[in-house]
């Protein structure tokens, strides 16, 4: 999955028309921030991203977008769950060689 595909899914998730480009710069920045946050969690991302990785990046970017409107909002449990599962899965694969 490419960053352009992630942007398309993010726009759909946020109910932003695909033809609207006025927020693309902001959304692309949020995608980049999400990539950094996910890797800081210890998750290794492939190139190109798998569907699971792309979805995780999109979910994180959507969370950051929504948090801008409500700074008191907490991370959705589904996002935290996905982060934890991906990290544990990768660590288990490393241990099992």
List each model region and its residues.
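Short, hydrophobic/amphipathic alpha-helical patches that form generic packing surfaces
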Residues: 55-67
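Short alpha-helix boundary/capping elements
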Residues: 35-38, 65, 69
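Protruding loop/beta-arch "assembly-hinge" segments enriched in small, turn-prone residues
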Residues: 67-97
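Conserved short "hinge" loops at termini or chain/domain junctions
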Residues: 1-56, 87-97
């Amino acid at each position: 999955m490419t960053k352009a595909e992630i942007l398309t899914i993010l726009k759909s998730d946020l109910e932003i028309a695909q033809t609207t480009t006025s927020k693309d710069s902001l959304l692309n920045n949020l995608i980049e921030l999400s990539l950094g946050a996910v890797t800081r969690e210890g998750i290794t991302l492939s190139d190109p991203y798998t569907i699971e990785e792309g979805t995780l990046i999109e979910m994180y970017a959507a969370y950051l977008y929504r948090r801008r409107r409500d700074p008191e909002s907490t991370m959705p449990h589904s996002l935290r769950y996905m982060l934890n599962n991906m990290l544990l899965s990768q660590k288990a694969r490393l241990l099992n060689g």
